[in-house]
Amino acid sequence: AGGIGVSHNGNLTNSISLRNKLVEEGAIFYTTSDTETIVQLIAKSKRSKTIDKIIDAIFQIQGGYALVMMTQKSLIGVRDPYGIRPLMIGKLGNSYVLASETCALDIIGAKFIREVENGEIVLIENDELTSIKPFSPKKVRPCVFEYIYFSRPDSLLDNKTAYEHRKNLGKELAKENDLKADIVVPVPDSGNAAALGFAQHLKMNFEHGLIRNHYVGRTFIEPSQKIRSLGVKLKLNANQSTIKDKKIILIDDSLVRGTTSYKIVKMLYDAGAKEVHVRIACPEIKYPDFYGVDTPTKKELLAANKSNDEICEYIGAKSLKFLSIDGLYRAIGF
């Protein structure tokens, strides 16, 4: 594309067909990334201005995406027509900054201005921002997993931190709960805020019954089952003095494949827990998300293939409940 860099958060749903077409037309690909497909489309455009080449490209792609591009003279941000993936605008002195989350702006001392709107392109040149809206208006449909899991707790989503949204998820989960226990234990760090909201609403004791090694990354997004299983052992350890002989309500943000939940429940029982009741601060995940979440097939999703009782038995818990869809809507305000 001649002097352009592209960074991409999301997933293109028509990347394979676009790639095949480009290869037939003579394009040479150096990676398997769908981001390169976007670069190839920009390079192929016959338009003279870079911004017009970008518009040509994004009219051909489908999916959930937030793009940040740089040329020698400009910074460009693009958000998909439904706003599935977030993109934020900040200001540092007289200059503009683009980032997927507001916490990135905080770190460098930039002031959060606003989100890039769904279907909007922002062109920044000579410290001036121009808004371009090439798509017809669409209803915003952000990915709910940004609220549940992806975004860092201190990042803003709809003028509330992800932490506040997750506490609300825990509060709504507590409203649907009919069980009393000795302690509420989060799966760190993803379940921390929801567990706190849950415990506060029911006036129950909140305890860190699991201690996390922060030098190990997220197990949910690891590519293979073997690595995910090993990751749980390396990442978490039971705090025996806190959980021994206790009836526990274990709170996590979500249950996708069940790998992590099974290992954690076993870990708690091995450490002396009397009962482990699992409560999940989002509804059952039964269908794949092709817009950027690592759930490629229905076969991998536990809730798509087992009943609630079967999942409970599979993970080894005394009982299992998920937040209702209505509870999710109330918590996030959709």
Give the label of every model feature segment.
Residues 1-117, 123-181, 187, 275:
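Conserved short alpha-helical segments that host acidic/polar catalytic motifs at enzyme active sites
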Residues 184, 191-198, 202, 206, ...:
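Extended, hydrophobic alpha-helical segments in both membrane/secreted and soluble proteins
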